[in-house]
Amino acid sequence: MFGGGGGLNPRKMKQMMNQMGIDLEEIDAEEVVIRTADEELVFDDAEVQLMDAQGQQTYQVVGEPESRERGDSGSEDDSETESGGEFSEDDVEIVAQRAGVSESTARETLEETGDLAAAVQKLE
């Protein structure tokens, strides 16, 4: 597809990516967790790369995940919103930074919505 030969020279590949406006960054991640309705996929010591292509960020995770069951996913979400304080300071900080609001506003919105993405979307 990219022509004959044994592959691209890494320097040439980097030059081509720069010309296309693509930045690649290694992230020193200790752990990556992907939560679904039924399970959590936990990557310990995963290789994570952030690719920024003209403002669109894509994360690539390479590693072997450990699968854990989540249990009652519906009641877990309800308890987070009712009890408050179930969100870590990192969660609150992420919402505050993404939405450009104070941490107290971010915390209140997290408690209302029960979800990071929904909180950011509501505040934007």
From Swiss-Prot:
* Summary of subunit composition and partner proteins: Homodimer. Interacts with the ribosome. Binds ribosomal RNA.
Question: NAC-A/B domain location, by residue?
Answer: 7-74
The answer to whether the entry has keyword Transport is yes
Q: What does this protein do?
A: Contacts the emerging nascent chain on the ribosome.
Q: What is this protein called?
A: Nascent polypeptide-associated complex protein
- Keyword Protein transport attributed: yes
For this UniProt record, the keywords arranged alphabetically read as follows: Protein transport, RNA-binding, Transport
Q: What is the lineage of its organism?
A: Archaea, Methanobacteriati, Methanobacteriota, Stenosarchaea group, Halobacteria
Q: Name the source's superkingdom.
A: Archaea
What GO molecular functions are on record for this protein? RNA binding
- Signal peptide span per the entry? none
Q: Which spans does this entry mark as compositional bias, Acidic residues?
A: 74-93
Please give the residue ranges the record annotates as the region Disordered. 53-124
InterPro entries in UniProt: NAC_A/B_dom_sf (IPR038187), NAC_arc (IPR005231), Nas_poly-pep-assoc_cplx_dom (IPR002715)
**Family assignment?**
Belongs to the NAC-alpha family.
**Pfam families per the UniProt record, alphabetical:** NAC
Q: Which source organism? A: Natronomonas pharaonis (strain ATCC 35678 / DSM 2160 / CIP 103997 / JCM 8858 / NBRC 14720 / NCIMB 2260 / Gabara) (Halobacterium pharaonis)
SMART domains in UniProt: NAC
* A single BP term in Gene Ontology: protein transport
